[in-house]
Amino acid sequence: MLNRPSHIRPVCYRLNDKTLEASLQSSMGLHELEEVDPSLADGHRIFYEREVPFELRSAQGNEEPREVGALEAIRVKILALGDEGAFTGLRVELTSESNLFFHYVHELDIAGFKKLQQGQNLMVDFAEYPSVMVRNLDNCIKQPHSHLAVLVMKRDGSARLDFIQNMEYKFIELLSIDLKASAEEVVRDQIAYRYNAMKNRMALMQARLADVNALVKIKNPSLLLQLKKASLS
């Protein structure tokens, strides 16, 4: 954010049609960018997307890791297939900004959910399962000392995500889901998308900044000079 000198009063201008059109075109560009997301290619739509603190652990063979893992912010994307309230499929994608090749997926349909439901005695149906996931993830964000998300990764590419509640006197496992590392071509497509998305967003922001500079230069050239000096100080 620019530090505006105290003697400069804020100046407001009414946007003309061309400026408004440029703003709309920028918004359309971002919308079109979302449409090429490979995660949405098979009809899924984004249900939830946030960064969540995860404890990452690496397992050797079938032995459970005993040491506490590293804490890292993992971006969680939940994608649903079908109409709201009548989902036919669900996919959870885990990615990391610090490691572009980190990409784990949990996929579940109605039949797979029934096995999960029976194995963990879940008292919800498949339509409510996404909300259960969201509640656990949000609890890990809002109450990190009492709600934990532990991701245990194995060498064969399989992984398990455990949602755990710390009750002071004991740990309670709320939910456990299986994931697996994505195939190389999937990871490659995801990296290409994220790179191009960032590149296009930067281009859109640079174009918008150029439009603002041009408008201020016409309306108030001295203000533009003062803003540039303030940004350099």
Give the role of each language-model region.
Residues H44-I46, E84, V105, K114-D125, ...:
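Short amphipathic alpha-helical molecular recognition features
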Residues E128-D189:
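Extended assembly-interface/linker segments at domain junctions
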Residues L2-Q143:
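N-terminal, leucine/charged-rich tether regions that mediate assembly and partner docking
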Residues T95, E107-A111, V150-L151, V212, ...:
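Short amphipathic alpha-helical segments embedded in low-complexity Lys/Glu-rich regions
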Residues M1, M28, M123, M133, ...:
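Detector for methionine-enriched segments
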Residues K170-S233:
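Intrinsically disordered, low-complexity acidic regions
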Residues H103, Q165, K219:
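Functionally constrained cores in energy, signaling, and assembly domains
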